[in-house]
Amino acid sequence: MNLITLLVLGVSTCLIYGIEADEKTSSALENEIVEILNGNFKNEKKSIETSDQWLKGRFGREVNQWLKGRFGRELSDQWLKGRFGRELSDQWLKGRFGREVLDQWLKGRFGRDASNQWLKGRFGRELSDQWLKGRFGREGSNQWLKGRFGREASKNDLEKQNGRGDSDQWLKGRFGREARKQLLGGRFGRKDMNQLLAERHGRETSDQWLKGRFGRQLSDQWLKGRFGREVKNDKNNPFRSRYTGDSTQLQRENNQPIEELRDNTEKVSIENKPIMKKTSVKISKTV
């Protein structure tokens, strides 16, 4: 056998022994490797220094240091840096071969700090806020996790996820049950349609706008379910006709432009105000 064959045989044997590193002590494993190399090179009348030179050219460092770092103890940061292109601590080996991966390794692996809570969440427990922050670029709360994995989602999560108002029907289909009243109450409060849409879009909105926004003509039933009974019970609200079933008034408003609708709204509000008549009462004083 030539020198190259012996070297390949020696390195292959080292790799096989390296797999069993957890079961053998560092000193015993190192001695076995040295004996194998010394035996192979003695038969070829070569010194261990020759192998050092070859391995140095092959791996860029002294063979003894490489063998010690590769098989006799935890891999050094220098070897790992050359092997994986980054700095890895000895703690990485413990995590790699059956022990918990420490924060230092996770920082190098994922480019951020990762706590032990992340590991617990990654392999069967709830993910911590720190992990969610790194994973999704924002602070992930426990409420988000509950909503993500089958429980009610907070109003902040729904707003970030969908960027729009979520109706009862959508929430029912999304989470398999009726959304809590607290959720919708937090989103819409007790505001009527006119005020809510004005705050959200900065203007009064008509049925034409709603049609363009939602792709269909919103019915009284949908509006009633979406905003509750607050507007319906408000007699002074100009949009009350949409909830009371007055189709004539609704059609008249739909065919009018927004400016006329505003004018009519003002007229309606004025007409609904009670008119107080002045009455003079004469009181005769009798002596």
UniProtKB/Swiss-Prot annotation:
For this protein, what post-translational modification is recorded in UniProt?
The N-terminal processing sites of the Pol-RFamide peptides are acidic suggesting that cniderian nervous systems may use a variety of unconventional processing procedures.
Q: Where is this region: Disordered?
A: 229-267
Keywords from the UniProt entry = Amidation, Cleavage on pair of basic residues, Neuropeptide, Pyrrolidone carboxylic acid, Secreted, Signal
Recorded GO cellular component terms are: extracellular region
> Where is the PTM Pyrrolidone carboxylic acid found along the chain?
Q53, Q65, Q78, Q91, Q104, Q117, Q130, Q143, Q169, Q182, Q195, Q208, Q221
Residues of the propeptide region, as annotated, are 22-52, 62-64, 74-77, 87-90, 100-103, 113-116, 126-129, 139-142, 152-168, 178-181, 192-194, 204-207, 217-220, 230-287
**What does the UniProt entry say about where the protein is found?**
Secreted
Histidine amide modification sites?
Answer: H201
| GO biological processes | neuropeptide signaling pathway
Signal sequence: where? 1-21
Q: Which Pfam families match?
A: FARP
According to the UniProt entry, which residue ranges have a biased composition of type Polar residues? Answer: 238-257
Q: Which residues carry this modification: Phenylalanine amide?
A: F59, F71, F84, F97, F110, F123, F136, F149, F175, F188, F214, F227
UniProt function note: Has direct action on motoneurons, and effect includes transient inhibition followed by prolonged excitation.
The record's similarity note reads: Belongs to the FARP (FMRFamide related peptide) family.
What's the protein name? Pol-RFamide neuropeptides
Q: What is the native source organism of this protein?
A: Polyorchis penicillatus
